[in-house]
């Protein structure tokens, strides 16, 4: 009788162990699947590509479909920054990595924006031509084609710099749509506060061009001058 219970107990324990192992294996597979983010040779572990000869930086991003209808002043924000959910494109690169990549590509940061002068100063620095591409896109679209300015004005994107402020604030801001003292790149067409404070302009993604929510894409920054 004791032997029977001993055998049954051992079989039960073995079954529990198998279930536990299977469960852990399933969790590992789910985690690996969730962790794998890849497109056009870039990934969450290698989100930037620098071509110093052609003066370009290419970044892996993901579309945030909310801002195909809602307004935002945030073009691209690092996904783990405090503003990571507020941008049209969620970036996989950190502000520091992006800043260093632009310098490696030949860009010169303007470093003219401060918290004190932000509402009266237009960002300076190397001018950037920005394009966006994704699987199935008809072409690489310019930033002006994928972002709608309610005033119909052209974007004037500049390598502002601001790495110290970016690391202090930890917002994750990579590309802002008005001049910004924190974002690595921002739009010299408007001064800070034009969107959220003074209501001079509204920005959103161009839903007639951009793909669906969560689509992976690449954004390429070319040093223009």
UniProtKB/Swiss-Prot annotation:
GO terms for cellular component: cytosol. Keywords: Signal. Residues 1-22 form the signal peptide. It comes from the Bacteria. The keyword Cell cycle does not apply. Residues 161-190 form the 4Fe-4S ferredoxin-type domain. This is Uncharacterized protein YdjY. It comes from Escherichia coli (strain K12). The gene is ydjY.
